[in-house]
Amino acid sequence: MNILKKLLWFVAAACVLFGCADDRMIYKPGSGSGNSGNGGGGEQPSGPGDYSKLTAANHPRIIMTEDDVMAIKTKLTAGTDANLKKLHECIMAYADKALTAKDLVYEVKGKRLLDVSTEAANRIISCSYAYRLTGEDKYLEKAEKDMQTVCAFKDWNSASHFLDWAEMAHGVGIGYDWLYDRLGDATKKSAEKAIQDYAFYCALNGKWNLNFYTSATNWNQVCNGGLVVAALAVYETCQDDARSIIDKAI
């Protein structure tokens, strides 16, 4: 996959996970009912997955690697790819806006923490990208601060609205992976614990109606996407749970 395609995938994923994550489930928690699509989108993967490269020495690894970062920098410097330039400027603009944004606060509206989760994920991902591309500490510091804030929340609202948790796990997972070599040990430990307690535990122990695994709504992409990103990010710290999450999603 070339660099432009990877960045386009990133932007598309952001649109799905952030822009389209509204409440479209047609069943209630614990009801056991719901829309369970039959798939049919192509061949299913077979055989055991290869997890051998998911080590502490191999970050960043989700969506883009360090080689991809260097290739993006080279293309941007050359100035020959107008589409890449526009995408880069769009992400950087969001990161710059995030630098002066107010601190995130645990605020549930109705049954949702979704607005906070969306803002957290957008900030963390855009600032993590900005740091990898520019090396400017202001982006690292902002992303790390927002990660620390949401990981100190009492929960990610998974008991009431699973989309909230999924977006939070996606943002923290990307921040953890892309900034791994620069995050403080306390921040990494906090992220690992939050992902385990607020995400994996809820999914693996049936704390929500788990029909999102086969649902034909946006809950499938958002919930499975957030779970898998988080599992890939912290795999080496909780291999059994992370592998269970990934295998079930696939």
Question: Where is each model-derived feature located?
Answer:
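Sec-dependent bacterial lipoprotein signal peptides
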Residues: M1-F18
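Short alpha-helical segments used as structural interaction elements across diverse proteins
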Residues: N2-I3, N58, M70, A120
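Short, motif-level signal for alpha-helix interfacial/capping segments enriched in acidic residues
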Residues: G42-P45, A57, R112-V116
